[in-house]
Amino acid sequence: MAFSQVQCLDDNHVNWRSSESKPEFFYSEEQRLALEALVARGRDAFYEVLKRENIRDFLSELELKRILETIEVYDPGSEDPRGTGPSQGPEDNGVGDGEEASGADGVPIEAEPLPSLEYWPQKSDRSIPQLDLGWPDTIAYRGVTRASVYMQPPIDGQAHIKEVVRKMISQAQKVIAVVMDMFTDVDIFKDLLDAGFKRKVAVYIIVDESNVKYFLHMCERACMHLGHLKNLRVRSSGGTEFFTRSATKFKGALAQKFMFVDGDRAVCGSYSFTWSAARTDRNVISVLSGQVVEMFDRQFQELYLMSHSVSLKGIPMEKEPEPEPIVLPSVVPLVPAGTVAKKLVNPKYALVKAKSVDEIAKISSEKQEAKKPLGLKGPALAEHPGELPELLPPIHPGLLHLERANMFEYLPTWVEPDPEPGSDILGYINIIDPNIWNPQPSQMNRIKIRDTSQASAQHQLWKQSQDSRPRPEPCPPPEPSAPQDGVPAENGLPQGDPEPLPPVPKPRTVPVADVLARDSSDIGWVLELPKEEAPQNGTDHRLPRMAGPGHAPLQRQLSVTQDDPESLGVGLPNGLDGVEEEDDDDYVTLSDQDSHSGSSGRGPGPRRPSVASSVSEEYFEVREHSVPLRRRHSEQVANGPTPPPRRQLSAPHITRGTFVGPQGGSPWAQSRGREEADALKRMQAQRSTDKEAQGQQFHHHRVPASGTRDKDGFPGPPRYRSAADSVQSSTRNAGPAMAGPHHWQAKGGQVPRLLPDPGSPRLAQNARPMTDGRATEEHPSPFGIPYSKLSQSKHLKARTGGSQWASSDSKRRAQAPRDRKDP
């Protein structure tokens, strides 16, 4: 019924007097009687009622004509959408596009029985239409209301109203709901079809039922296909109905014009979706957003509930084409990878000289490209011939060509108070526990920041040289008749695959490594590979070796006293008595990188053959894991002065303000070098007698018998020793009779030891001082004592506790003659 008729049923309107002159005037019983007379008896009866009731003529000639043309006889059976007959009108048999999709396979839908005409039916006459394509959720608050008004023709440089509507359609993502009295614009309709088919946006259209035929003509010109029906729902509706007492009714038209987009925007006004309304008619629209859009949401759902479906089966359509691939814009993550993020975000990594983001991204892309198979390398092929492959940029375009932040200035760092020349220390970082209110220096965790760029470059060069050099071949043992003809290949090391082996923990007792000379040697070593060396305490105490060209053969680094070498006693180790040894022994720290070949490192594999005088010099005990290897008198050797050991970057370093000399070594080492040169001149006279003892004959040195061990408890494999050791083995029972001015007594035995030939090329090579001009850093002891203070024996004894070391040496010397057995 009309709203005026509904108001009559309300108790508030009983005996309510309202005249035509009041604004609230809406319902009039006199007007209702005049309309019933018009519908039942025609125009003459209408004018008679107006004159009798003395009311105004409230209908125009156009309205009278429209009412008379739309009068219908009320027939309850004719309202059934499943019925048949010519009275269906624009509903077109009541089958819409939603039902058509379900019956598109050609199978006819079975007709249901007609509904009963009972007063209280058991089921409804028609089903409630559902928003099956989806609808935005109803939210409590949609935001602040905003409105923009657009005119046609546009004013003040505004966009024309058709452009505003089409832009809203192209920006829709969820749903588009259109209510229109006349819809015949093909351009707007094509935009709606593309939004539903390509972007999967739900499209609902409600048009006036009196103009459905014009809408269907427009669909024929739009070249639709079956794919457009998937996300499209079209329905029709009219105005409100006016029922009379003569079982007749008439209906108004749908004059609402609005479009509801995504639940938060709406456009409404006088603009109809026609070409004339956008070009020749004067119209106005309002673009609304915010809370006011809720009224359009509720109104459309109510209209959709009372609407009728529109069938599109009579429209010629093509088959559904292949869906075009959706090319999504490539989104580069703003957050970099974990390895890059550490260097960019964490201030600690800002101190390290790392590569730029471009270089890191380039290296990572090259690694990924190298991992691909050969058939997949290169840019990936596009799915379609017209498509070009998209290459993702390495970093976000907004970050290109931007200067990196220097986080070093924001850190609590400071330089070393007394830095050494060429130090790689950049600064320190203090980490403070936030739970401590006033932290003391002892409660701070101090982190030392070093420059690792040079060490990284050297490691890369060494790794490349390891990969590029040829594979070594085993060398047969030299003939004893020509002991000085050849040099053993690969330093006489065992041959095997250079597979990386896992690191082992640092042992408590470590063997002293033999120092490798830079030049080739005239002594060849023949090494018998042991099958297995028994580790002690689960730790392998063997030393790794680096086999490769460029490594010199083994050379024994002998220990002499800092006094006159000719005054060596017989029967006492190193020519010293117990008291003098306790006072004058200098301990020199050796690191893993001090030797020329790196043979002092720890790792699996058999040890190099050694020409040490006794087992007591082969092994020694290390008190703490953090204390490096120690050896007596390693700065003054019979083969010439060795360059001062260089401090490795990974070793802990504490400076005491002492610098090396201008010639690259300590003054004490230079004075010892001069004394050594004098000693070599005196040994030159005995060169002829020493040549016979320096033969390259090898004797098998066996392990002690079962149940016995070496001096430090290490079961050792069979070893080959040079002729210098064979002289000791053959003359053990002879006593110290052979000890001459150029022989020295072994520490653990009673057999004199022959010094190398002073005139050998190896000796001359090692006797040359460093001339490269590079000032090497001193390698301090674990207690921070530089080399220049090692000559002060009492100062060293106070720091390192020499009595403990001396007592351990005396025990080893006491049991050495018992443990050493003849081969």
UniProtKB/Swiss-Prot annotation:
Location of the region described as DUF1669 in the Swiss-Prot/TrEMBL record: 2-312
Ranges annotated as biased composition (Pro residues): 497-508
Segments of skewed composition (Acidic residues): 578-587
Lineage: Eukaryota, Metazoa, Chordata, Craniata, Vertebrata
Gene Ontology BP terms: BMP signaling pathway
Outcome of swapping F300A: No effect on interaction with CSNK1A1. Loss of interaction with CSNK1A1
Cellular compartments per GO CC: cytosol; nucleus
Name of protein: Protein FAM83G
Bias type Polar residues, positions: 452-465
Quaternary state and interactors: Interacts with SMAD1 (via MH2 domain); in a SMAD4-independent manner. Directly interacts (via DUF1669) with casein kinase isoforms CSNK1A1 and CSNK1A1L.
PTM statement from Swiss-Prot or TrEMBL: Phosphorylated in vitro by CSNK1A1.
Subcellular location as annotated: Cytoplasm, Cytosol; Nucleus
SUPFAM superfamilies named in the record: Phospholipase D/nuclease
Residue positions, PTM N-acetylalanine: A2
Keyword annotations of the record: Acetylation, Cytoplasm, Nucleus, Phosphoprotein
Gene3D superfamilies per record: Endonuclease Chain A (3.30.870.10)
Annotated Basic and acidic residues bias: 529-543, 672-681, 809-823
Organism: Homo sapiens
Family the UniProt entry places it in: Belongs to the FAM83 family.
Residue list for modification Phosphoserine: S4, S124, S127, S356, S610, S614, S616, S650, S666
Region (Disordered): 75-108, 450-823
Molecular function as annotated in GO: protein kinase binding
